[in-house]
Amino acid sequence: MGANQLVVLNVYDMYWMNEYTSSIGIGVFHSGIEVYGREFAYGGHPYPFSGIFEISPGNASELGETFKFKEAVVLGSTDFLEDDIEKIVEELGKEYKGNAYHLMHKNCNHFSSALSEILCGKEIPRWINRLAYFSSCIPFLQSCLPKEWLTPAALQSSVSQELQDELEEAEDAAASASMGSASAGSRPGRHTKL
């Protein structure tokens, strides 16, 4: 076991939306979990790979111009090592895929709560995800909030990099396959499995 590392919930105000929702006592917040000087968060995109991304802790500018840092909430501590946390985040990425994002049922705050429960045994404070709870009771609210407005810019960058990596891997595999089949053709009796 490692040293006790603080587990911190960084909360960001989506200030342009809160101008409308604060009058009814509901804020719209983005959150991420900070541990070992790294912050992990979740957002949506249309692809079937992880929607989890990493930013510099508390840096709202990496999320985009509509986000403002609100506060840091210490949730507890963890004895997991940094390598363990990377594995946990990778495993959570199988559940928190970009195309599984749903504003009311699987959003950044749900991810933060899941990671916090694993790391220190505590959920995030309920007020942070209050909008998801209330809007699940009032279905028309879901249609009032476009999903693309709530995808942090840092995630867009992460998605672009993931797509570029997949494209390069596909090109490398295609080049290897064509080289392999060309050389396989010159050897009698050899079969190339694609």
From Swiss-Prot:
Gene Ontology cellular component annotations, sorted alphabetically: cytoplasm
Domain PPPDE: residue ranges: 5-149
Family annotation (InterPro entries): PPPDE_dom, PPPDE_sf
Subcellular location: Cytoplasm
Keywords tagged on the record: Cytoplasm, Hydrolase, Protease, Ubl conjugation pathway
Compositional bias (Low complexity): 173-186
Catalytic activity field: Thiol-dependent hydrolysis of ester, thioester, amide, peptide and isopeptide bonds formed by the C-terminal Gly of ubiquitin (a 76-residue protein attached to proteins as an intracellular targeting signal); S-hexadecanoyl-L-cysteinyl-[protein] + H2O = L-cysteinyl-[protein] + hexadecanoate + H(+)
Stretches the record annotates as Disordered: 161-194
PROSITE patterns: PPPDE
Gene Ontology biological process terms from the UniProt entry: proteolysis
Biased composition (Acidic residues): 163-172
Family per similarity comment: Belongs to the DeSI family.
Self-association state and partner proteins as the record states: Interacts with RPS7.
Protein's name according to its UniProt entry: Deubiquitinase DESI2
Species this chain originates from: Sus scrofa (Pig)
